[in-house]
Amino acid sequence: MDFDSPEEKEFPGLYASEAADAKSRKSKEESDFSEDHDHSKKDLLIGRRKDKKEKGKDRGYAALEGESSPEEELDTKSPSKSKKSKTFKFTSSKSKEKREKSRDKSEKDSKHAEEEPSVSHKVKEKERDKEKDRDEPKKKDKEEKRKEKDKKADKKDKKDKKSKQLSQQQDDVSAAEEVLALGYPVFGVSVSLATERSRCHDGVDIPLVVRDCIDFLQDHLKCEQIYKIEPIKTRLMHFKRLYNNREHDSAVDELNLPTACSLLKLFLRELPEPLLTTDLVARFEEVASHPKVTTQQAELQQLLEQLPKCNRTLLAWVLLHFDAVIQQERHNKLNAQSLAMLLSPTLQMSHRLMVALLCHCNNLFADVQLIKYVPPLTSTSPKLPDTPEDIQTELRKQDSLLSQIHSEMNAGFITKKREEQLWEVQRIITQLKRKLRTFEKKQEKTAEEVDNSSSAPPAVASEDTTDSKPAGTPAVSTNNSISQEEPKTDTLTPKDAPNDFTIDPSTGFILLPKSNPHRENLLRLQIEYDELMEWQNELKARIVAERNEVYRLKQLYEQQSINSQMASLASGSQAPPESDYERIIEHYTRENALLEHKKNMLGMELKEERRACIALQVELRLQQF
């Protein structure tokens, strides 16, 4: 077989034995060569064998030798190739031992490699366990922190819910107030409606916002900035909302100069029609253009009388205030012309007409005076008036305020603030009436004392006239005089004797003679005492009945609480959360406080009414005697 074939090149080991046999056969037939040539070939073969052994060791298998080089292919054709194959067979035992050793080593290495992953796996598991043990406290800490965070989050949620509820309640209150402002406003309506909805309770028929602004500006007439600077818009809108919602309190919400000026101008600007009315404003303009001053004043007076009363009153207050501003021209640098330039557009009139009205205002409104407004008393007021006249004026103010509250509540604008204000006004009215009644009683007593002192005869003169005797009477007539004096003394004793009284069999009252000045007073006191004792007995009976009712309700409550606990245990129903309990408790505490206040007010009113009934009963029973 040709060694140069591709099969020989690809698989040299398969054809090595056949080549060796062929070479051995040829070697016997060939002639002997020289020794030098043999020795050189042997050396070459030995070197090649060593190379082949080293290559076999490196490759790790002995059955197949490495690929033959081109030199080996040439040498296989030589006659001495049989010796080479025999030497290769002799060295196979050593190579086998080496191969076995290498195999043992490889097996040991493989076993060791197999054992190493198992050991390393165990070590890793131990390390993981240790890490888990180490991580357990950390995990616990993390869980505790997470729980704390959850608790904080729950608390925040509860607070947020409470804040939302409070905000909702505030929104509800503000919504109710906004409904009042939208449905019953003061700004942007006619003068009559504004006066009715925000009246001054001292009898002046102008809106309260105009009165407050004018009262404040009257104290700052000398200020140079009056009607010249603009306020902060948010502050102006805040005061507008307060007056629309009837919440303005002069003690809390204090005006300043720019706000007072702009608030007055805002009210006048937002009027739906001019202050002089749309029907008469053209005639006012015609009169203002009249050249004669005297005829101008008379015609203006006639036109003013045709205005509605509330429009005329408001115009009078505004013009008199502007006149007071002009009178301080030396300080505020404002005269009639400059003030008319500033405010005539606000009043919806021409500059000429406003100047004419300012010139004649003192004559046109001679009966009007700018009086500072004193609001009605409130619960925070220090004390009640001390004189009957002041009490009567305050009663008129409180009655006016009460009628205004009733009209607003009848229109459907009912809020808790309105209810509290209603009870407060009623309480103040009862206190004022009680104090006025005490003054009236004192006046009646003083009048009775004056009448009794004027109608009583002088006692000394009667005694002198009875005891006087003639100077020249004889001594024999002494017995007659004594006998005549005895009946006189008998007739005087019934008048002066303190025990001269009678007892009424039906009532048991002590009755003095009709001529006695203390008869009526004593009888009045006895009747009043009798009425008060009846009231006391009635109250005692009611107290006993109330105590019995309380005892009955306590027993009923205990039975119902036991039944409800048993029912809840049987059903196993869960109680509502604490937030709901807190909300319910807050709601009912507020309601109870309001009801307690109402109860106290009603109790005081009932007491006053009962006292008035007793006084009337006393007067009726006095008529029987």
From Swiss-Prot:
Pfam families per record: RhoGAP, RLIP76_Ral-bd
Keywords annotated in UniProt: Developmental protein, GTPase activation, Phosphoprotein, Repeat
Regions of compositional bias (Polar residues) in chain numbering: 475-484
GO CC terms, sorted: membrane
Impact upon substituting I229V: In RNA edited version
Annotated site residues (Arginine finger) in this chain: K228
In-chain residues carrying the UniProt-annotated modification Phosphoserine: S68, S69
Organism superkingdom: Eukaryota
Domain Rho-GAP: 191-385
Chain intervals for the UniProt region annotation (Disordered): 1-172, 443-500
Ribosomal protein recorded as keyword: no
Gene Ontology MF annotations: GTPase activator activity; small GTPase binding
Bias type Basic and acidic residues, positions: 1-11, 20-60, 94-157
GO BP, one annotated term: small GTPase-mediated signal transduction
Binding partners and assembly: Interacts with CycB and numb.
Function: Participates in receptor endocytosis during interphase, is also involved in mitotic processes when endocytosis is switched off.
Protein name stated in the entry: RalA-binding protein 1
Origin species: Drosophila melanogaster (Fruit fly)
